Amino acid sequence: MNLHAPNAEQDDIEYVDVCAVDDLWDGEMDVFDVGEHEVLLVKHEGRFHAYDGICPHQSVSLVEGHLTEDGVLICKAHEWQFSVEGGQGINPANVCLQSFPLKVEGGRVLIGTEPLPKEGEA
């Protein structure tokens, strides 16, 4: 089952098993080394989301921030805000988080080793 719907073919993606589905409670997040990337895994409203774990502003680990009940991920350094649904910037609106493909199989969460192309990239 794929609980994150990327717009990319997933047949040739290499995935890494990072945790069990039950390891993260709703509203929790954790960071994992996946390939050469630090990837933030967030569970919100029963769905998993995977993003680059480093804030695009000043390279602060996003896992040190917090997730609001309404799905806003806030960086601890300068309170940049991102929607957990898709990684779109809220404050500032012109910046977004890099998404990673993920899937759930056999009660395990697997994250792709390479980020998905940003919108407009091939």
Curated annotation (Swiss-Prot):
The keyword Cell wall biogenesis/degradation does not apply. GO terms for molecular function: 2 iron, 2 sulfur cluster binding; metal ion binding. It is found in: Cytoplasm. [2Fe-2S] cluster binds at C55, H57, C75, H78. InterPro entries: Rieske_2Fe-2S, Rieske_2Fe-2S_sf. One of its GO terms (cellular component) is cytoplasm. Its cofactor is [2Fe-2S] cluster. Residues 16-111 form the Rieske domain. Induction: Induced during growth on aliphatic alkenes (such as propylene, ethylene and 1-butylene), epoxides (such as propylene oxide and 1,2-epoxybutane) and chlorinated alkenes and epoxides (such as vinyl chloride, cis- and trans-1,2-dichloroethylene, 1-chloropropylene, 1,3-dichloropropylene, epichlorohydrin, and epifluorohydrin). Repressed during growth on other carbon sources. Pfam families: Rieske. SUPFAM superfamilies: ISP domain. It comes from the Bacteria. Ferredoxin component of the alkene monooxygenase multicomponent enzyme system which catalyzes the O2- and NADH-dependent epoxidation of short chain (C2 to C6) alkenes to their corresponding epoxides. Functions as an intermediate electron transfer protein. Homodimer. The alkene monooxygenase multicomponent enzyme system is composed of an electron transfer component and a monooxygenase component interacting with the effector protein XamoD. The electron transfer component is composed of a ferredoxin reductase (XamoF) and a ferredoxin (XamoC), and the monooxygenase component is formed by a heterohexamer (dimer of heterotrimers) of two alpha subunits (XamoA), two beta subunits (XamoE) and two gamma subunits (XamoB). Belongs to the bacterial ring-hydroxylating dioxygenase ferredoxin component family. This is Alkene monooxygenase system, ferredoxin component.
